[in-house]
Amino acid sequence: MNRVWFVTGAARGMGVSIVNAALQQGDRVVATGRNMDKLRQIFSTVAAENIALLELDVRDEHQAKVAVDAAVRRFGRIDVLVNNAGFCLLGRFEEATAEQIELQFATNVFGTANVLRAVLPVMRQQRSGRIINTSSIAGVKAVANATFYSASKFAVEGMTLALADEVTPLGIHVTAIEPGFFRTEFLSNSSAHYGEKKIEDYADFGDARELLASADGQQQGDPAKLAQVVCQMVEMENPPQQLLIGNDAISYVMPSLEARIKEIREFAALSNTTDFD
């Protein structure tokens, strides 16, 4: 069956690759983003009957509802939602301002929720749908120098898992994808944000901009292959609720998961001391 995809953050990075992969397999796509000129440029060769380009700042709940309504008017349904819009705030906990923290959560967490609230009534009426929320390895094992990005992705993980339990009985499958490092502009100066405060006590441990600048353009992950993984997952009868993507993702996360299990067992006796006598 040809599906209708609704993709946020479609004007760059993994969003572009996911849109292209869906189109290549004969599906139709609603590609959304804040920069309409960029969307038109990227997808200028796509036949008009296969794509709809819509302006969407996910932080705007009303705009999310308007975009979803327009998508349904155009294609009649939404089979796959990919919540891909987001950015990374880099820097240590104390280096970020309150305004920067709020913007990180407004985009990565509340923006995801805004689009979900707009799309879920459509999928409930259909009694079917696939939702892909873009998390990160930072949502499984927190990354130093990306404190609030990690926190935002932990929030996405919790939201995804709870939502999956709520809507799976309605025929809607929800997955958090947890990519490692992929070769996109995600770490570039045009995309990443940095904490505005500089604290001398941390100087000897390196600067987030310097630490990650050397990795930009050298990431081993291929976003086109990630998009193929997403397409395969959409075809699964019982997709995972969480999916690590990338060899580096598994190698990064597994030691922390094993350490957590070890810690739980080590302190189980202390944990079990709180029941009434």
Which residues does each PLM region occupy?
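Conserved glycine-rich cofactor-binding loop
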Residues: 11-13
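Conserved glycine-rich Rossmann-like NAD(P)H-binding loop of the short-chain dehydrogenase/reductase
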Residues: 25-40
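The beta1-alpha1 cofactor-binding region of Rossmann-like NAD(H)/NADP(H)-dependent oxidoreductases
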Residues: 56-66, 98
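Substrate-binding pocket helix/loop in short-chain dehydrogenase/reductase
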Residues: 92-93, 100-102
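Active-site helix of classical SDR
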Residues: 116, 152
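Residue(s) in the substrate-gating loop at a strand-loop-helix junction
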Residues: 136
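C-terminal beta-strand-loop-alpha-helix "lid" module of Rossmann-like NAD(P)-dependent dehydrogenases
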Residues: 168-215
